[in-house]
Amino acid sequence: MIITKLHIGHLIQDELRSQGRSVAWFARELGIDRTSCYRIFGAPSIDTLLLIRISLLLKVNFFTFYIDILQNKLD
């Protein structure tokens, strides 16, 4: 089963913008370069440990998006 409706990179980028944070800040806090940030924003899926780090950094549980989709598929 593939979850096609969720593009986690776009959700992360949208949240970063809504918090008024820059890509430079995001890169610095994650210890990565800006190019890697744009790769994250463009990616429809993401490594679990990286998503945990991003969730803690932005104080948003991005896993809830997956849980909602999974629950709808299970119902």
Segments from the language model and where they lie:
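Short, basic-rich loop-to-helix N-cap that marks the start of a DNA-contacting helix
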Residues: 43-56
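Short C-terminal boundary/hinge segments that cap the last helix of small helical domains
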Residues: 59-75
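Key DNA-contacting residues within the recognition helix of helix-turn-helix
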Residues: 38-39, 66
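The DNA-recognition helices of helix-turn-helix-type DNA-binding domains
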Residues: 33, 44, 69-73
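Short alpha-helical DNA-recognition segment
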Residues: 20-38
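A short, Lys/Arg-rich alpha-helix, primarily the initiator
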Residues: 1-25
